[in-house]
Every structure is written in C-alpha cells, then in structure tokens.
Curated annotation (Swiss-Prot):
Probable secreted aspartic-type endopeptidase which contributes to virulence. This is Probable aspartic-type endopeptidase ARB_07403. Residues 1-17 form the signal peptide. Residues 87-97 have a biased composition (Basic and acidic residues). Residues 18-87 form a propeptide. PANTHER family: ASPARTIC ENDOPEPTIDASE, PUTATIVE (AFU_ORTHOLOGUE AFUA_2G15950)-RELATED, BETA-SITE APP-CLEAVING ENZYME, ISOFORM A-RELATED. It comes from the Eukaryota. The active site is at D125, D314. It is found in: Secreted. It comes from Arthroderma benhamiae (strain ATCC MYA-4681 / CBS 112371).
Amino acid sequence: MHVSTLLVAVLLPLALSKPTPRKKTGSFKVHLARRGETEYSRDGPTDLQRAYAKYGIPTTHEMDGYHPQHISKLPGNSKATAGSGKEGVESQDEKGEVVNNPTNHDIQFLSPVTIGGQPFIMNFDTGSSDTWVMNTQMTDEEAKKDHHLYDPSKSKTASKLVDQTFDIKYGDKTHASGPVYSDVMDIGGATVRNQAIGLPSKVAASLAEDKTSDGLVGLAMTKLNTIRPVKQKTFFENLAEDLDEPVFTAQLRHGKMGSYEFGTIDKSKYHGDLIKVPVINENGFWEIPCSLYSVGKLDKIQTIQNGTGTAILDTGTTLLVLDEKIVKAYYAQVPGARYDPTRFAGWVYPCNSPMPSLFLAVGTDHMAIIPSSLLTFQSYGPGPDGVETCYGGLQSNNAGGIQILGDVFFKALFVVFDQRGPSISLAPHA
C-alpha cells in the first residue's frame, strides 16, 4: 500500500418553493462571531454526549445523569474576552464583512446571520441539512431566555409553508421540531429570498441551554433534510448556481479568528497544495474514507479492522470521535492517561503529560496530522491528588459505527467543501 504525505513549512498539518437569490453573488466571506459570556458553558463530556445523540451512538451507562464539571481554561491559554455591544456582533468593515471571534475555548464556532431583517448568531453545521432558529412561537418561555428570537410577524418577507413541518432528531435526546417558514436569509451580504427555515415550537433542553447560539444553518446534502412532505434545499445549495464556484471553505483556527467563505478558494489561507478526496454522499453527509492511522510518527500505519472505515466532516461537533481501536492506541502513548467511567465518562490524563501527534487517513492515499497541541480539549483543574486533569479532544465512538471529524480536526486543516463530485479538499492552515 502506498500512502503519500505532503510536507509543508510548519512540518505537516497535512501529510499524506424555488428559492431565488437576489443577484449574482460571486463569492463572499463570513468571519466567525462570538457572544458575550453567559452562565451556560459546555464541557467535554457534555459535548461527547451531544455527538453521540446527534448520530444515534449508544451512550455508556456512566453518561446517564452526568452533570457538567467545573471548567478551567486550557493550560497556557488566556481567557477570551467577552463580547461587547449587541451580543458580540460588531459592525461591518469597509468590505462588508462582520468581524469577531470564536466562543470561549474554541468550543463553538459561530457566525452572524440575518433572517427577515432580524440578526442572529448561528452555528454552521456540515453534519445536518436543516436551518432552524429560536423564535417567538416556542411554547417554553424558559427556552426563549437569552436568545435572539425570530418573529415572523415582524418580517415583511416571511410566509408560512402550509402543511410543511420539520423534526430534526439527534439520536433520541436532542431535537427541534415545528412549522416551516420561508423568508429572506442573508449571510455575509449574500441573500436567498425564499429560504426554508424551521421554527421549532419546542427544542430539547440542551439546545435551549446553549445561550451562545440562536440556531443552526445546515450545510450537508438535501438527503438529510427533515422537512416534510417536501424536502428543502440548504442555503448553500440554493446559492450555489450564483457563486463563482459551487464551494465553501472552513477556516476554523485554534484561538484565532476564522471564517467561512463561499464561492471561492482563497490560496492565502493554506500552505502547499490542496489534497482532493471524493465524498461518499450516499447518506447525505460530507463523508470520506478514513481507515488508516498512526500514533506519534508514520513508521507504523495501522488499519481499523471490524470497525468503521469512513468519517463525517462535521463543523457542528467539537470533538474528534474515532474508532475505539485508534483511541486506545493513542492514549496508550500518553503517560497517566485513563478512561474515567465515573467523573468524566471519557479519556483524561495529567495536563503535564507529553502528547503525541495523530496521523489519520483522509481518503485512501493521504494522511493528515493532528498536532498534539490540538488534542487537549480542556483542563478541569487539580484532582484529589493535586494533579491537573485534562480532557482529551480525541474520544471513542463507543463502537457506534460512525467516526466524526469535528472542530479538533478543522483546527488542524483548511477544508474545502465542493458540490462538484462532490468532494472535499484539505491543506494545512497558512
């Protein structure tokens, strides 16, 4: 087997109703945004639970009744400053770009969106195909608190899609469901006039409690769309014909501003050459072959056996969730690492332990490297023995049959999503 790697300047982060757009768009960029500090904050085990629920992966019994632990900042990281003004949405610059930062600890990368002239901060999710927003029609008053709420009665362009409903379920715990409206949706100055938008009448508590985000913009394929009886296209699919190229790119960087860009591939955002990988789109995901791995260095590439040989690129998941064989092989090389079934229901280790990098197949001919610096998710402070405990950004898929390349993966690589094929392309961040 021949597996190529690509060396770059910083040594390897890649080695081996008909919607009508307003006008010809060409290309546009959306810089990531953040909300101000809120009382709600995620933690590693909670994010792992959400990933399991989203893809229907069975949880371990230790996760039942789990409550978030105290969260500390990552060792050596300064705490992000709180947003100011209206929930951290800053004014546009001379190019019409909205500029701000990701949320605390890179936990969630968010973007400004306007629906019917009303502003929101939303999560771009390549792992789903529904766009939905918190709204005034929700029946739970508690769920409305600390969110921007879309009010269709205040939009001159809103119309209800008669008899259309959506019901997106993330496993059996997290969900959003309700009627569907059509309205003008604007992202970064690019507009779709009749975008289908779900208005949940109820949402799962875990979604309502996430005060950083007002909803989701689904960017997977239409096949995953849950609107019935007629599936609706995503914002990207509606806009694709009016773009210079039917692509969007994700530049999600650790501790820095990033962006999504539609219609063009900015060569200044990455090093070296892009590696193109065909997408397995039969299930509606941005899914690629991913069955090879190596820990520390490329001297011994191993293959997943009796597991899942593909992985889904999902900007809506924070962690890197891989086959249990990979996870065990990785943490076997981290001194003091252990699976903690009681306090964390996941892999933890002393924060001062040296960490190896992880090589992971992207397609059948190339390996990507996830640097060790990106594989610590967060610190929980000193334990009973006085040793600071860290939660890993790499966690097991619990033999769930699905591997998820979440934001830990994206922080290592610049990624192009291309409708042609479809395909994805990857290179190290510039």
